[in-house]
Amino acid sequence: MLVTFTEAAATASTSSLISFSLSSPPKFHHKSRIYGCKATFGLRTKPTSWIAAASLSSSTTTTSSCGSSVFDPLGIEQDNSWGVASAWDGVLKFVSQTFESSSGTRKDRSSSARGVAAAIEDSSIDFGDFFKGPLPGKFLTLLGLLALSRLGIYVPLGGVNREAFVGNLDQNSFISTLDSFSGGGIGRLGICSLGIVPFINAQIVFQLLSQVYPKLQDLQKKEGEAGRKKIKQYTQYASVGFALVQAIGQVLFLRPYVNDYSTEWVLSSVILLTLGSVFTTYLGERISDLKLGNGTSLLIFTNIISYLPASFGRTVAEAYQEGNYTGLAIIVVSFVSLVFGIVYVQEAERKIPMNYASRYSGKSGGLQKSAYLPFKVNSAGVMPIIFSTSSLSLPATLARFTGLDILKKAAVALTPGGSFYLPTNILLIAFFNYYYTFLQLDPDDVSEQLKRQGASIPLVRPGKSTAAYIKTVLSRISVLGSGFLAILAAGPAVVEQATHLTAFRGFAGTSVLILVGCATDTARKVQAELISQKYKNIEFYDLEK
């Protein structure tokens, strides 16, 4: 719309002024206030002469601001109470300036506080900061709970020939691995020998069911923290059932080694083993409440650490008896190299840069440094190895109950050292790793979450294109993760064949992966706790100062 501004001359010697009234120009005199336009409209007049320019610059009342705040270009609304309006505008101007000054001060303090927070994150953490907060008390409570979890392992079941059972235990790689997870509880036949394994099995089952059963999937994703608490409660109930089934299976497995296999012994043993597993699961939940790491992982970490000296001692004794010092040196070097390799791969990640609609840093004016989407190289963890080991032990378990010759031959071929053990194990690990990677990270779900947050990948359209791009990245990462897990699973078998030492069989690469992963996770939690202690001293929005 084109608006034409006409000039109305007040006197012959004064400047020309803009008037928005097209019907009748107002009359001016030397004491009246001029109702024109504010400078914020960007409208300027051009004087007709240098005398008019001088007159315009000397008149402070005409060039400061307009008296009326109503934009009325057609002159429909006339305001005769110019004095009250001028006073009211003056009050509003003063109040607005006051609040703008207050807002500017708050922004300055907020930016300075964020600067202090960034300096805290970048600064190194002193060892003395550990004793300034609640961390010492939390660690003492953690050590007490872990020690309490170990007591049940040293309370054995009665009436079992332990020497004969331990001799057969070394020949079964799967049970040896479970024995390392329980900290030697299976070998000692303790009442807490099942440990946290039934709870882990229940978690695996519910993770698989959440992808098949839509109600569980909605409960996990759409209901937030309340839904996750319900799933956790269902998992705890299911772990009791798994503990009962595994206790019955362990009692049946112990039948050849029991002196008096009676109904009373079976019932009492099943009840004790089930209660021991429930007690261990309860301790794991209390450990998780300390927020120093996952309680399940810390329990397994403690059991593996306690199993390590005995396993290494048996390996050293076997090497000295056979005079195989070269094999012992190879095992030590392989173990150290394995630890460093696991640390490197666990910390490796694929970073996809992200663009956010409104996430900019205050100082530089550009995107924040953390504007990327990280994907771990080994996002599936140890679950593919556990699934593969369980699958390889299935023929031996079925052959024990059925007695079929074909199952016995398959069990011999799929045991460590068998002809089909390595290729079958690697293929199963690759399959389960690919499946479990996409079970944890759904590309469509990730794409939808990025779209809701206003984030996008550069040169990739939001929606289906983003989901396809993420799927391609995860597929390539799963190949690297499968190769890494295959080395972990097949490495101990290769070292065993090269050194001819079997005492270290139960302590596989899976155990080292759990140790390293749990240690790094706990270190991150402690560092986050120390940083949060320093954040408590920062006042981000303090208006009184």
From Swiss-Prot:
InterPro entries: SecY, SecY/SEC61-alpha, SecY_CS, SecY_dom_sf. The chain crosses the membrane at residues 139-159, 189-209, 234-254, 264-284, 292-312, 325-345, 379-399, 412-432, 477-497, 500-520. It is a multi-pass membrane protein. It comes from the Eukaryota. GO terms for molecular function: protein transmembrane transporter activity; signal sequence binding. Its main location: plastid. Pfam families: SecY. SUPFAM superfamilies: Preprotein translocase SecY subunit (SSF103491). GO terms for cellular component: chloroplast thylakoid membrane. Keywords: Chloroplast, Membrane, Plastid, Protein transport, Thylakoid, Transit peptide, Translocation, Transmembrane, Transmembrane helix, Transport. PANTHER family: SECY/SEC61-ALPHA FAMILY MEMBER. The central subunit of the protein translocation channel SecYE. Consists of two halves formed by TMs 1-5 and 6-10. These two domains form a lateral gate at the front which open onto the bilayer between TMs 2 and 7, and are clamped together by SecE at the back. The channel is closed by both a pore ring composed of hydrophobic SecY resides and a short helix (helix 2A) on the extracellular side of the membrane which forms a plug. Belongs to the SecY/SEC61-alpha family. This is Preprotein translocase subunit SECY, chloroplastic.
